[in-house]
Amino acid sequence: MPIPGTERKTHQMKILSAEVLNLMHIDLDKREALIRDVVYEVMSGLDAPDLSDQIVVTYWINAQTLTPAEVGKEISYHMTSGVRKSPPGSLLDQCTGRVIDAVDFDDTHRMGVVRVGFPLKMLMDEGGNLYSTDIFHITAGEGVFGLTENIDVKLCHIAMSDDVLRLFPGPAYGAPGIRQITNWGDDVAFGTILKPCTGITPEEESEIIAQAAANPLFIFVKEDENYLPGVPFAPLKDRLTHANEAIRRVSDQRGDKGLIYAPHITAPPHILADMVKMCVDAGMNGVMLSEYFIGGAIRMVRELTKDLTNPPVIYAHNGGISVRTRHIYREVLDLFTRLDGGDFRQTAPLTNGSSLLRPFGVEWKHCEYELSRPLAGHPPVMMARAGGLDQGNIILNLLDVANGAGIANYLFLAGSAVNGIKNPLGEYDPAIGAEAMRQALQVYRDGVFTRIDASHIQDLKSYAYQNGLQALSTALAQRYHI
């Protein structure tokens, strides 16, 4: 027993004033949604800018003393030539930004939208290449976000001409290519994530891989992002050896359906290229990484593998993105992930209640738009609806995509909804989770539910019970405690 008075206090309270608490309790998601709605409304009424020699960036501004137009001039000054006035037609002039236009939001003239043009002359390299790292280095630098004059700034949109968009490599495959190389046709594409997330040996992981790879429901299987490639108990090279063996061992159970397997390779820049080469040498047809703490990593992998006959599919994981999206809109980051070469990109599933993960609402719609819209010949990304996707909301998501863009550009990616379902012995049994997902898909195909309401989970559970869909009934009971 600890000596009285020496126990560590784990719960304490500090009394704060109502004013401080009110500021701390601001609903930032609600605020972001309101700002985004107004920004897009304003943008829709602006004239199309001249993009022949510049990219045009839209910022939302909340300043202390300057108008949005004046803030735009400061951004141009600090982040382009650093010259207030340049000789017309000079090289200096060609490397100096311009304010295109501005819209004030109130009579204080301190809040609004401004569009700033950044010259291509100062952004392109000597080979005529353009890089997202350089674009963000300039358009989202400290001369934008670090100035104390600016209470809050958001980078909302970057407009580029088709000629500029074609300077980027884009996805090697995208959704159409992924379906082609796996012989998936127009079937619904499901994927799963290996669990446990970490703390397993290559031998243990191989058994989990074999279970998933044997199931022709899945077009895609990936490691979890928590399973770092350099851990001593499971170094990547050993994992690849065992993964290959596991996939080969069960390949005859897949019929004519291919499978993309993506090991996790996120690593520091001086190591990452070696990780990519290791995967290529091992014959891996996919890799997964997040670049938000390693700038430019997606483009690096794309460039490193572009001359291969069959480059690996890139699952551009978005781990770390939310630390940026209060200032750089997520849809802008997703656009550049597509341009840099990501083949898969997570958005988020629709759910029957509050979303587990961002994005949602208008942000979510714009992300899916940027990942799939016509883009100077670049293929659409295969969007992974993941993060809480399960048997209870899969029909909602299938109905949504069927009534919208169609299933072709979507991967329905479930982790714990497959690998976290237990059998009657209390053991985790991915086969039950996968079968439950297959049964939910069949319920959708049978047209049992044409719309989803508040009672959907209970209604689906009742239908599963009445029709002998034991796996689906079990999964819903465990996921929703019903």
Where are the regions that the model predicts?
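Extended, intrinsically disordered, low-complexity segments
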Residues: 425-482
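Active-site mouth loops of central-metabolism enzymes
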Residues: 60-66, 188-206, 260-271, 318-329, ...
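N-terminal capping/small domains of soluble enzymes
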Residues: 2-207, 211-213
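Surface-exposed amphipathic alpha-helices with a cationic face
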Residues: 178-182, 240-255, 301-309, 362-377, ...
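Catalytic alpha/beta core domains of metabolic enzymes, predominantly
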Residues: 272-277, 282-414, 432
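Glycine-rich, proline-tolerant flexible connector loops at the mouths of alpha/beta enzymes
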Residues: 218-240, 349-356, 422
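N-terminal active-site wall of soluble small-molecule enzyme domains
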Residues: 239-246, 251-255, 259-280, 297
